[in-house]
Amino acid sequence: MENILKELKFDDRGLIPVITQDYKTNEVLMMAYIMKRPLKKSLETGKVHYFSRSRNKLWLKGETSGHFQLIKSISIDCDADTLLIKVEQVEAACHTGHYSCFYREISGNELKETSDKVFDEQKVYEAENAKILQEIYDVIVDRTIHPKEGSYTNYLFEKGLDKILKKVGEEAAEVIIGAKNRDKGEIVYEISDLIYHLLVLMVERGIKLEDIYEEA
């Protein structure tokens, strides 16, 4: 395995792009990233593991939905900087409910959907989204019980309520700026930051997620 890893050209973050294809039809299912550890895990288990840049963690495809990708073959391109993984796809690859993530086609000045959904993504992911928020909340609570040196969360708690409120205000302003710029990626990034700081504020004030859900 190590000799294969030496052949691959990972970028300065340790990532290498992966194109995933249906092994029967050769339909391109998705594009993602992988690191050495998830690649090893993929080869050990026969199921594709990626690296989630947004969550900064190893990610087993299908761990939430059950829509696993069973590996049939892995190829390396001529420059050794991209992988092609052919898989047997369980149900569908795309979190939107489509079989492939490439379900939209540029048609003139419009985007046209070229395939129907094969599952209801809201039913599949709704409970998981709430679970992710709870996991983040629990990590923040754990930082108050088991502080870690260099932890930004602990830094906020050490500085106190005024610092936390200042950060919430700053992040809310960043969301507004992102929205005015009409940049979806910027808005998503800033909203994520705002949600994190709101969760820190909730923990500091002793407010649980259940308290919020009851008001919804």
Swiss-Prot record:
Entry coiled-coil feature ranges: none
Organism: Thermoanaerobacter pseudethanolicus (strain ATCC 33223 / 39E)
GO cellular component: cytoplasm
Keyword DNA repair: no
Source organism superkingdom: Bacteria
Listed name of the protein: Histidine biosynthesis bifunctional protein HisIE
One BP term from GO: L-histidine biosynthetic process
Keywords from the named record: Amino-acid biosynthesis, ATP-binding, Cytoplasm, Histidine biosynthesis, Hydrolase, Multifunctional enzyme, Nucleotide-binding
Similarity field: In the N-terminal section; belongs to the PRA-CH family.
EC number of the protein: 3.5.4.19, 3.6.1.31
Gene designation per UniProt: hisI
Record-linked InterPro entries: His_synth_HisIE (IPR023019), HisE (IPR008179), PRA-CH (IPR026660), PRib-ATP_PPHydrolase-like (IPR021130), PRib_AMP_CycHydrolase_dom (IPR002496), PRib_AMP_CycHydrolase_sf (IPR038019)
Pathway stated in the Swiss-Prot or TrEMBL entry: Amino-acid biosynthesis; L-histidine biosynthesis; L-histidine from 5-phospho-alpha-D-ribose 1-diphosphate: step 2/9; Amino-acid biosynthesis; L-histidine biosynthesis; L-histidine from 5-phospho-alpha-D-ribose 1-diphosphate: step 3/9
PANTHER family cross-referenced by the UniProt entry: HISTIDINE BIOSYNTHESIS BIFUNCTIONAL PROTEIN, HISTIDINE BIOSYNTHESIS BIFUNCTIONAL PROTEIN HIS7
Region: Phosphoribosyl-ATP pyrophosphohydrolase, residue numbers: 133-216
